[in-house]
Amino acid sequence: MVTKKIGVIGCGNMGGAILYGALESGVLAKENVYVYDINPAMMEKAKGWGVNLAADDEDVCKNSDIILLAVKPQNAAEALEQCKKALDGKAMMSIVAGVTVERLQAMIDGTPRILRLLPNT
């Protein structure tokens, strides 16, 4: 089981599926997971899984060691702008379609380590 604190920004179809799978398989403990989504319905879904609900994107980053960025491409810059100050020393995984690691680093001044994942649906 992963003991680091994991943050998920975006709990829609992809982010939610990854999170749910990790929780159900026992890879992640719900008390170590922080979630934020701009859609209240997605937050309600995450609440049902027993994870910690964050107040906003920055709150996710402040409380997490590793962050999964799972937002729509058009929402990435706004989410990262909110997180910028809380990303120092963190690692980030991104499943944001069409947004390169270089672009993500430019949005946040290149502070955290970023890994880009390409899930196949």
Locate predicted features.
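Rossmann-like NAD(P)(H) cofactor-binding subdomain of soluble oxidoreductases
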Residues: 49, 57-62, 66-121
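NAD(P)+-binding Rossmann beta1-loop-alpha1 motif at the extreme N-terminus of oxidoreductases
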Residues: 1-55, 59
